[in-house]
Amino acid sequence: MARRNPLLFAIVVTILFVVCYGSALIAQTPPPVDNFVASAHYGSFKKRHGKAFGGDAEEGHRFNAFKQNMQTAYFLNTQNPHAHYDVSGKFADLTPQEFAKLYLNPDYYARHLKDHKEDVHVDDSAPSGVMSVDWRDKGAVTPVKNQGLCGSCWAFSAIGNIEGQWAASGHSLVSLSEQMLVSCDNIDEGCNGGLMDQAMNWIMQSHNGSVFTEASYPYTSGGGTRPPCHDEGEVGAKITGFLSLPHDEERIAEWVEKRGPVAVAVDATTWQLYFGGVVSLCLAWSLNHGVLIVGFNKNAKPPYWIVKNSWGSSWGEKGYIRLAMGSNQCMLKNYPVSATVESPHTPHVPTTTA
């Protein structure tokens, strides 16, 4: 990946906002950050996260990245009145390039999403008019997990969707194995990226729809390695197929309401410094990260999606982020997929098993 000067990041952000949104925004170059103020915040950051660096060169590099991120957070806050960005989170000493390399997969998505098409059919029943849904409250969402230094967001997104569909259809909630996909799925590329529908396709082709429990095949790729597949474990859930949902937020909301959580891809470039609130103006160029929609609230101002991430519970709102509904924030509607699960409580849905 080509190196960019992190000191230009905030200015580039400003220019891109103006180009994309025209006169609706007033360009603001973030003010310089005083070294004394930055040093005080940096000291608190290191203490909070137990950070220690070897040598003056590395220390200086981390401080400069942190200082630049203070400017970036300032700018993002000026553009998002309902959200808060700051440098208290664990990623604040990374340059944007380092963050992207460690936690995002832009190259994989660019190579493999060209032929992604939505399925025509989703649900024949009329919308119910439900204004808010949170599948966490319905017992269909497992605790927030952590992918670590492995580019396995796709596996966490796919498995989170299957966990949610399994529980929403009437089965008991069970934490399922991301490691099964990271190590064994030979359609995707482990820590180097993957796609959620490809993962579901592999489950159908190679496992007859069966997914192991996390307890029987725990996650071990947090350090960035891909252990060999041992392809054995206790089956915790079974899918009957998968669907690529319409690229339409209302249709996605219908699926979330009636069926359960949905796996989606987003541009998470600016999530590095997200702390809380509803993101209403997300910088987005291309998809690079897989996450899980677990609910929405149309009554809120602004209305928002509830999105589960896989960077641990110390990130964002205890591992979650809220994105404003209706304006394709972070390109959330561009790649929605869901597994299907057989249940006596839901009608038959056409599936893709390829």
From Swiss-Prot:
Residues 1-24 form the signal peptide. Its EC number is 3.4.22.-. CDD domains: Peptidase_C1A (cd02248). GO terms for biological process: proteolysis. The keyword Protease applies. It holds the Pfam family Peptidase_C1. The keyword Protease applies. InterPro entries: Papain-like_cys_pep_sf, Pept_asp_AS, Pept_cys_AS, Pept_his_AS, Peptidase_C1A, Peptidase_C1A_C, Peptidase_C1A_papain-like, Prot_inhib_I29. One of its GO terms (molecular function) is cysteine-type peptidase activity. Keywords: Disulfide bond, Glycoprotein, Hydrolase, Protease, Signal, Thiol protease, Virulence, Zymogen. The active site is at 153, 289, 309. Disulfide bonds join 150-191, 184-229, 282-330. Glycans are attached at residue 208. The cysteine proteinases have a potential role in host-parasite interaction and virulence. Belongs to the peptidase C1 family. PANTHER family: CYSTEINE PROTEASE FAMILY C1-RELATED. This is Cysteine proteinase 1. It comes from Leishmania pifanoi.
